[in-house]
Amino acid sequence: MSNSKLPIKYGLPERLVVGLLNKLTKGHLKVTYTDGSSRHFGNPDEPVSAAVIINNDDEFFRRCAYYGNVGMGEAYTDGIWDTPDIRAVISWFILNMQALQGTDTSSDKLPGVGLLKIFNWFRHLRRANTVDNSRQNISEHYDLGNEFYSLWLDATMTYSCAKFQDPNLEFEKAQTAKYEALCHKLKLKSTDHVLEIGCGWGGFGTYASKTYGCKVTGVTISEEQAKFARERVKREGIEDKFEILIQDYRHIKGQFDKIVSIEMIEAVGDRFHQSFFAKCHEVLAPNGIFALQMITVPDNRYKSLTKGVDWIQKVIFPGSLLLSVGRVNEVLLKTSDLFLHDLEDFGAFYVHTLENWHERFNAAKDSLLKLEFDERFMRTWNYYL
């Protein structure tokens, strides 16, 4: 049955969602109802590129209409809808992102959708990254257990974008290539004392101290990460080179020749950007270098992101916020005499990084289930990865 002949059965929520999807013209999404009937969105002349199979029609449209992208994500993890290929569904929405978002609005401002998003927004506001909240926010994600992450991260235990100069490069080598690139940008010497803000499981600090002979002080607020990193340092025999501290960045003291921070600043939040960069300026030695790897958004979308909350912010990284390059420059001007000297964009490598994580995560499914992570958890992380 075609879209035009299929009646609206579930009232205003269905009408709003169908009305929005009808505006999307790229690709071909097939949505199948519980009775077997279906609607087609995008370009019907193209082969079906993504499929949504609804298991509870009424609840699906209610979640999507009331809570926007957050509702759709939570509906997936709750089994309200399914798909043979979650990446294809998300790719279809990305393909139509311009129609969904325009040039300066967030995905939570879809016309007529997300009617109750204010409840998620208030919840997000309560998770602002104060010293106490930061520990809670980080713990919820990174303290799922070192065994959990070791089952699907590569051997370096790196949880950030790798650098694939060659798309066929082995994952571990691509992560090591990223570390080497950062060391090169930092112009590391054996006499340097390096501060790593957000040291994770110790991958970069281990590489830098062993390869360049420099001293590294790594700070984290994750108890699990600190435990793993300290054991790693001892195992590698670099106790005299690499020190791990459980410490909030706001409490860092001393002076360092170089600073590095790898995809940690996303956990700082708009309210605390100035304090973050002011602290970096305070502890960086004269003529020092600060290498910052971060996930960015276009400048024209940053402001809108500060006023909304998406599924990842609610479910995966509470309190998080992506920055734009313009936002970084704005804060640097207000807080320090630091300036942007070199900018490299390797965001395209995140495609390969996520592909590796997704495949490795699902390959470890049986082991993860034995750790008492249930099917809902698996669906949540599949949606994320």
Please report, for each region that a protein language model flagged, where it lies by residue:
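Conserved SAM-binding loop of SAM-dependent methyltransferases across substrates and taxa
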Residues: W201-G213
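Conserved class I S-adenosyl-L-methionine
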Residues: S190-G200
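A short glycine-rich, Lys/Arg-flanked "PGG" loop and its adjoining helix->strand segment in the class I
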Residues: Q274-P286
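A short acidic, Gly/Pro-enriched loop at the edge of an enzyme's catalytic core
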Residues: R250-I259
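Substrate-binding/catalytic lobe of Class I Rossmann-like enzymes that use SAM or dcSAM, i.e.
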Residues: T296-L385
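Feature captures hydrophobic
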Residues: M1-Q175, A181
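Conserved beta-strand signature within the Rossmann-like core of class I S-adenosyl-L-methionine
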Residues: N287-I295
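Conserved SAM-binding loop
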Residues: A229-R230
